[in-house]
Amino acid sequence: MDQNLTHRNHYIPRFYLKNWSLDGKTIQTYSILVSNSKVPYWTQQSIKNSAVWNDFYTRIEGDKEIDNFEHWFDREFETPAKPVFDKLLNGQKISYEESVVLSHFVFAQYVRTPAAYLRLTEQNIKLFPKILEETTAKINREAEKIRKGYPAFQFQKTVRESFFPMKVTVDKEQSLVEIKAVVGRGSYLDNLKHLLSSTLKVAEHHDWRVLHASEDISFPTSDDPVICLNYRNADDYDFKGGWGRKNCNILMPLSPRLILFTQVGAKGPYKDLDHSPYYSKLFRRMIIQHAHRYVYSDRPQKGMLELNARVVNAQLYEREKQEMAGWHIEQIQAERNL
């Protein structure tokens, strides 16, 4: 095994989580899924061991393991965004170019978490069977034409390299083509590469504003910190908004006192939201409700059971633990068994 591989993939950057750390090393963590009721509601965890999934981004090429996604995130998104975050936290204005860097980071963060993996995988499972069926049928029709003497159809070649685990079997005698694919880590990484290259442009023109919490509110963050919000009123909203969908609100906590906000297709300054006790309380509620498995804070927060009650389930907890532990081997085997 290559000793230079990262393996421990942080899906939330450590520099970001440190904004909720009182000592620069640890953070208060609320677990939504626990093994038994005796587990404390809040525990102090090392940032180094928070928001980590071993080999979440590791991919396979032949017999070689490659972790260039982790380095790509750091090089293309985290490192450029760090000084922009520092300016926002210090109350400084940012340039248009820095706003684009910020947009790239927030968009990347939206799609790089376990919660995003589940969203995209669910979407892939729904779409891919039909896509593969249509593609196979088209290839088979063209193969039959070739067998009858018609000229070969020139299929358009894809420009981008695909990480999608796929096997194509050709039966020359029957002029049939069979396509098999695995929907899992490989398809997710393929999604990420596409989203963070060609689709990334959709995020570049948002008018980001930094909103302040009211004095009595402290914003937490979570393991799924970017919220795409369809908001109708305080009792009627959902988290299924889109980056290019007009009037969708996009939020991301920056610190216990600050939250990043934009509305697609609109311009700020959103003065009625800034320092507002009403909206600060509402944003805090949304952050907690949107969490996948963990809420992070600088100190234990009250009212968690009302907003996102933890699930006490030993079997489910153990199953998820085992799935994460066996994730890498299972994904490798699935791809090699194609």
Model-derived segments and spans:
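Alpha-helical structural context detector biased toward long hydrophobic helices
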Residues: M1-R8, R14-L338
